[in-house]
Amino acid sequence: VGNVHVVADQLGVTSNARVTLVRADLAMTDVVTKDWFKTMTITHAEGTSLLDYARLSSLAGAPLTYGSEGRVELVTKTTVFGREVEAVITGLLRLNAKEQTMTLSDAKIAVAGVNLPDFTAQALLAALLRPISLRGIPLGLTATRITPAEDGVHVDLIGDNLAIGP
């Protein structure tokens, strides 16, 4: 077939992929199929996608939203001196491309409106939020870059020698 350009919504939903994408825009090169796209091999694929905060929250096991200025926010309840208080954690999303995980860095934490020192913030963040795995992106693609925005996390994708099929 040669080259194929695919723009898809809800990529991974029908295959029950671990990581589903709201939208994906992919360029595929050297696409070969012998059964009218029931199966195919793709020499190279790359493009962009959108991971919404609902799915990201599900993967993280914690409610994540967009904060501001490229930061992601986690609001959680915690107990301090026997009283339940709200903790607001904001941080920059960082991708570990080798491990295919995301973490929050440069964390800022406010508990009951009081900003915690950086060391305390990092320790609390480590206890509350583990690295978020991106393994299981549809089609065997991997993330190369992430950019948080109001509509979700924009994820650049790449894949080589992909076999797609039933």
Question: Language model features by range: what are they?
Answer:
Residues 11-18, 79-85, 112-114, 162-166:
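Short, cysteine-centered beta-strand-loop-beta hairpins and adjacent loop/turn segments enriched
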Residues 64-65, 91-95, 146:
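A structural signal for short hydrophobic beta-strand segments in well-ordered beta-sheet cores
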Residues 114-166:
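Extracytoplasmic/luminal low-complexity segments enriched in Pro/Gly and acidic/polar residues
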Residues 1-55, 62, 67, 71-79:
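N-terminal beta-strand/beta-hairpin edge segment
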Residues 71-120:
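Short helix-loop boundary/capping segments
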Residues 39-40, 44, 97-109, 154-158:
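Short, well-ordered strand-loop elements centered on a beta-strand within folded domains, enriched
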Residues 10-12, 30, 78, 91, ...:
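A mature extracytoplasmic/lumenal domain signature
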Residues 1-5, 18-25, 83-90, 138-145:
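Amphipathic hydrophobic-ligand
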